[in-house]
Curated annotation (Swiss-Prot):
The gene is lspA. This protein specifically catalyzes the removal of signal peptides from prolipoproteins. This is Lipoprotein signal peptidase. The chain crosses the membrane at residues 12-32, 70-90, 102-122, 137-157. PANTHER family: LIPOPROTEIN SIGNAL PEPTIDASE (PTHR33695:SF1). Its main location: membrane. One of its GO terms (molecular function) is aspartic-type endopeptidase activity. It comes from Klebsiella aerogenes (strain ATCC 13048 / DSM 30053 / CCUG 1429 / JCM 1235 / KCTC 2190 / NBRC 13534 / NCIMB 10102 / NCTC 10006 / CDC 819-56) (Enterobacter aerogenes). Pathway: Protein modification; lipoprotein biosynthesis (signal peptide cleavage).
């Protein structure tokens, strides 16, 4: 028995497209308008700062000689496939989980595109307090973190709310 895509979690794939457009658009603007290492202050505690990340979160394995590019690309593809299957198997009415999965897929694909096209991930958001700076990140990273937080949140909701949220 075949399911209509609109009756499955794949109905929420538009979120993936939105994340990709916003993420890749922001990275394009940075690449076109910033020199590597350039910083522009937006607000107190928030800068735009063009950085290249050859590793994963917090530049994990960034200095590993290049193999990590393909390793992290493979992980991204695997995660996207698993989450797309989960979306297909879930009902479209399971909004919270499906939106979370779509945010993670969109973020993973945004960073995957960077890895494959540029050989590095473009980062640009620099949050700081005083002299302490958080790791520079991008909108794809934000989408992944928000998606993961939504999955954790869903785990704390009562089961009656999970069916409709």
């Amino acid at each position: 028995m075949s399911k209509s895509i609109c009756s499955t979690g794949l109905r929420w794939l538009w979120v993936v497209v939105a994340v990709l457009i916003i993420d890749l658009g922001s990275k394009f603007l940075i690449l076109q308008n910033f020199a590597l290492g350039e910083t522009v202050s937006l607000f107190p505690s928030l800068n735009l700062h063009y950085a290249r990340n050859y590793g994963a979160a917090f530049s994990f394995l960034a200095d590993s000689g290049g193999w990590q590019r393909w390793f992290f690309a493979g992980i991204a593809v695997g995660i996207c496939v698993v989450l797309a299957v989960l979306m297909y198997r879930s009902k479209a009415t399971q909004k919270l989980n499906n939106i979370a999965y779509a945010l993670i897929i969109g973020g993973a694909l945004g960073n995957l595109f960077d890895r494959l096209w540029h050989g590095f991930v473009v980062d640009m958001i620099d949050f700081y307090v005083g002299d302490w700076h958080f790791a520079t990140f991008n909108l794809a990273d934000s989408a992944i973190c928000i998606g993961a937080a939504l999955i954790v949140l869903e785990g704390f909701l009562p089961s009656s709310d999970k069916k409709t949220s």
